[in-house]
Structure formats: C-alpha cells, structure tokens
Amino acid sequence: MWENKFAKESLTFDDVLLIPAASDVLPSDVDLSVKLSDKIKLNIPVISAGMDTVTESKMAIAMARQGGLGVIHKNMGVEEQADEVQKVKRSENGVISNPFFLTPEESVYEAEALMGKYRISGVPIVDNQEDRKLIGILTNRDLRFIEDFSIKISDVMTKDNLITAPVGTTLDEAEAILQKHKIEKLPLVENGRLEGLITIKDIEKVLEFPYAAKDEHGRLLAAAAIGTSKDTEIRAQKLVEAGVDALIIDTAHGHSKGVINQVKHIKETYPEITVVAGNVATAEATRALFEAGADVVKVGIGPGSICTTRVVAGVGVPQITAVYDCATEARKHGKAIIADGGIKFSGDIIKALAAGGHAVMLGSLLAGTEESPGATEVFQGRQYKVYRGMGSLGAMEKGSNDRYFQEDKTPRKFVPEGIEGRTAYKGPLQDTIYQLMGGVRAGMGYTGSENLKKLREEAQFTRMGPAGLAESHPHNVQITKESPNYSF
C-alpha cells in the first residue's frame, strides 16, 4: 500500500474529449431515455440537485414535465418536505385515484385553504368521510363572489345536474364528456361513491408535455433527500406516505458505516421505493452501497462549483475518473450510477454519460432558472439568483450539517465545505433543458450513439492538455453577443 500511495492518476471533464466516430445517427433521432431502477424511467438523463437553492416542488414539477427528475431538498421540516412531494404528485395526473374531497359541513374557508395550498380549482363534496357518496362539487366559479368564508360549503356548492363517469373511463372518453358539457372536472363514481377524478387541466398537460416522467398511475415522478440524522426515520415514513418515488440518502461521504446501515434499513423498510445512496468516488464504495441494498449510487466528492471539500478536507477524485471507476463496479451489479457535480457545459454532460453515468445531477446549471427557490437579486444591473452549497454555513445552519457529519456541533463550531454565491438568472427551466439536451444530442450524433446505452458502451475518449482545452474554447476573438449555451 505504501508503494502505491501516488499510483493513481485521475482526470476530469477538461482533461478529455470524446472521439468522433462513423455515424448515421441524426441528433433529432437519438433516444435520451434511461432506466435508473425498476420503477424509475426518465426521458432525459437529468436530475436536479437536492439543494435548498435548486429544488423544491416548483423545480421538481418542471423537471418531471421535461422528462427528468427533481430531488426535494431536506433543509425544511418533515411535514413541509412531505407537502412539497405531495404538490409534485398531485400537480397532474392521468386519473386522480385518490382525489381530495370535503364534506358539506366544512367551511368555505377550509375549501379555499385546500384549493390554494395545492393550486387546484375545485374539489368534490361527499356526504361523509366514510361512505364518500358524491353529493356536489365546489369550484372557483362557486366562490367568485363569496365574502363570508365562514359559511358552510353546502350553501354554495353545485349539487344539481352533476356530470360523472364510471371508474375505468379513458382520458379520450373523459375529454369528450368534458367538452360536451363544458366543464373542467369529471368525478369518477362507482355505486355513487367517489373513486377518482379527471380534470381538463391534466388532459391538457398530457398533450403539452408528452415526454413527462411519470409513475405507473400517471403522476409526475418525485424524489426527496434524506440523511442520517435523528429525524430520518419519521422523515422517510412521511415522504413515502406522500407518494415519493425515490429516496436519496444524501451525505458527503457515502462510504461510511452510518450511511451503509441507513441504506440497509431504508431498503428493508421500504423495498418498493427506489433508494439512491451517495456520495462516493471509488469502486469499493460503490460496491459497499450496492451490497447494502442501494438501487442507484451517486458519484461525486467535491467537484461542484460551490463545494470546497477538496480544498478544505484535501479529499476527492476528479470526476471523470470517479464516474468511470464507479460505473465499472456498477456494471457488475447491473445497476445505475448518477454523476453528481462539476458539470459546466452540455459537453460535460455527455462526457459524464459516456464515462459510465446513467444520468447527471445538476446544481449550478439549474440554480439560475425561474423555477429554483433561490432568491432573486439585482447586481450591477443584471438579475441573479442566490446559489449556495449544502456545505455552506447558511445551509448547514438550516439543517444540512448532518450531511457533513456535524449534527452534534453548534453553528459557531461548523467547519463548512461549501460557499454561498450568486448565478446569472436564466429564465424558464425548459429553455435551459432544451439547450443542454441539444448539446447532448449533438454529441451522440458525432459519436454514432443512437441511445445512451450505446454511448456508455462504445464511446471512446482522448486525453488533452491545457493547450487542447484552450483550443476547445473560443479564442483570439472578443465575444460580442452572448450565446444561450456558452459562458466562460
């Protein structure tokens, strides 16, 4: 071991390029879908990071609609995080199998609160919680001129000539009924009992976002981060009850006893849930997490733009080598890895995928979008959004200290492994995703890869030095107009 102390040489994104290959593949024809686990299939290989300035429900909804996945961060209370997951799962459905409902004795105020919280425009009214016999419907139209919100729902709900359909009605059949009767919500009933709901909004969303990433019930996919802290047990339980599709056991060092034990426990308790564990940077760590029960392993120790782990702790593996080493081990288990961190351009995404990643996790590239929860600032006449690492002092004070195994320390004793900063405002997420995936598609065309599996298995790299990197970027010219997919 002593003799091999300096034997390892590692590479990162700026050290390599993909070699062009013979190709009859057009970028517009490539397949970007990827299966991360038995229950998680994405239509683009992109996941938004579980960071408190990157992903809450708004980002997760937008990511899933684009075909990717969002990880709700855990720097919030247990109930609040579960609510964020519920917002994603209820944002659109093919058929809502467990719709919200109220009873006629409840107040209009309660209805208004429910509709506002989940951004829904109406709710079915049933006789009681047990029998759930449909007796009316309450919509925004019924509430339009209400001034006294203390009155009972029974005083304002629509109860005559209710239009319903039987359980099993298809979306096409439902659309015809909704259009015929000029209504927006169609309750599904069986023997008078409310069993489901189809809305015109959900049908429109299916048409608007045909490649959305959804579960078997037609709901958008949602993931959430957990850690190894004292509240992890109840947090995981509440998230599963909220309908989460994947739990991300998110720590700075996944190759540790506490994380491995947590993976075993979570997978044994919730075998139906996809468990993602990390972060790691070696084949040995990847093997340990897969053997513990992880479905997917997340790779990256310190490559992120806001991470200082490598300079504070002196630890890490340059990301291309880390991804390749971990992917080599993952192949033996027939499982997937996620490349997390260090990605600055769309070209880095395809490099990470070609090195063995099934998907990439993005933070800085998405933090400036409209859907991120970071605060908007104006600096020197330009709009920015706040972006910080989960190892920064601010994030650790809000709850991410357990990620860095400092749960028992007071804020004054924290040793941060991240910084707080700002990133340029970019507008809607879909514009950024379009440019990023356009770059990936182009790279797949250059390498003759019609799908991501072929890219992983057959794409070849060449190493380059600093001169090669300088040659790769625009040079000997002054840029006069910003490009939507390049800034340096």
Swiss-Prot record:
Span of domain CBS: 95-153, 157-216
Residue ranges, annotated region (Disordered): 467-488
Reaction catalyzed: IMP + NAD(+) + H2O = XMP + NADH + H(+)
Annotated NAD(+) binding sites: 250, 300-302
Active-site residue list: 307, 403
Any one Gene Ontology molecular-function term assigned to this protein's record: nucleotide binding
Keyword field contains Oxidoreductase: yes
Keyword terms, alphabetized: CBS domain, GMP biosynthesis, Metal-binding, NAD, Oxidoreductase, Potassium, Purine biosynthesis, Repeat
Binding site for IMP: 305, 340-342, 363-364, 387-391, 417
Cofactor: K(+)
Gene3D superfamilies cross-referenced by the UniProt entry: Aldolase class I
Pathway membership, UniProt: Purine metabolism; XMP biosynthesis via de novo pathway; XMP from IMP: step 1/1
PANTHER family: INOSINE-5'-MONOPHOSPHATE DEHYDROGENASE (PTHR11911:SF111), INOSINE-5-MONOPHOSPHATE DEHYDROGENASE RELATED (PTHR11911)
Sequence similarity: Belongs to the IMPDH/GMPR family.
Task of the protein: Catalyzes the conversion of inosine 5'-phosphate (IMP) to xanthosine 5'-phosphate (XMP), the first committed and rate-limiting step in the de novo synthesis of guanine nucleotides, and therefore plays an important role in the regulation of cell growth.
Oligomeric and partner information: Homotetramer.
Name of the protein described by the UniProt record: Inosine-5'-monophosphate dehydrogenase
Gene: guaB
